[in-house]
Amino acid sequence: MDPDAVKSTLSNLAFGNVMAAAARNYQKEVLANEKAQGSNPVNEEVDLDELMDDPELERLHADRIAALKREVEKRESFKRQGHGEYREVSEGDFLGEVTRSEKVICHFYHKEFYRCKIMDKHLKTLAPRHVDTKFIKVDAENAPFFVTKLAIKTLPCVVLFSKGVAMDRLVGFQDLGTKDDFTTNKLENVLLKKGMLSKKKKEEDDEDAEYQESIRRSVRSSENLDSDSD
């Protein structure tokens, strides 16, 4: 199959899926407004097909679709910088890692410390949730220069960097209730309050997830087209 044709098909499928989602959202808004005004939405159904062909709807949602595409591109750019996963870095790479990203959460750990393993588990969960923040860890035994420079005395120690500057830190579990059974959400909320994570609205998460799924469906459809052509 012609590669350009595949790309065109993928783009059209993705756009169609997003527009379908937009139409469903618009339909919900219309029905909600009717209900608020005291009308009966059961007797005033909105035709989904008509909404899909409505140029006004396309205009209203064009900016949102473009914004979603920009967000996907932004996420890919972050991932190329090492965001989106919880990685171990060496002392030699440490300085470059914390200065190349605006927000960096770095866990100084010891491989034999039980509490460090607990912190590892939670940070590993948070890393893919918050792609705009970089999550890394450094073996304190193998990074004596920065352990001394940052005056790290207790492990686990999670140092919070903003634009290359250590702005704050979590020492042990002091900010987490001092017990070992704190939840990932507890840690997430602490990091949110300290400005290290960006809080997204639920509807933005839903829309982004739906857009990502539409892209995946389009890719699968494209692959099926390739198989059929064979």
UniProtKB/Swiss-Prot annotation:
GO molecular function: beta-tubulin binding
Subcellular location: Cytoplasm; Nucleus
Main localization category: cytoplasm
GO cellular component: cytoplasm; microtubule; nucleus
Residue ranges of the region described as Disordered: 197-230
Chain ranges passing through the membrane: none
Keywords: Cytoplasm, Microtubule, Nucleus
GO biological process, one term: cortical microtubule organization
CDD domains per record: Phd_like_TxnDC9 (cd02989)
Record's keyword annotation contains Phosphoprotein: no
UniProt xrefs under InterPro entries: Thioredoxin-like_sf, Thioredoxin_domain
Domain Thioredoxin intervals: 89-173
Classification via SUPFAM superfamilies: Thioredoxin-like
Keyword Cytoplasm (UniProt): yes
Top-level taxon of origin: Eukaryota
Tissues expressed in: Expressed in embryos, shoot meristems, leaf primordia, root meristems, floral meristems and young floral buds.
Protein family (similarity comment): Belongs to the phosducin family.
Record PANTHER family: THIOREDOXIN DOMAIN-CONTAINING PROTEIN 9
Task performed by this protein: Tubulin-binding protein involved in microtubule formation.
Name of the protein this chain belongs to: Thioredoxin domain-containing protein PLP3A
Species, as recorded: Arabidopsis thaliana
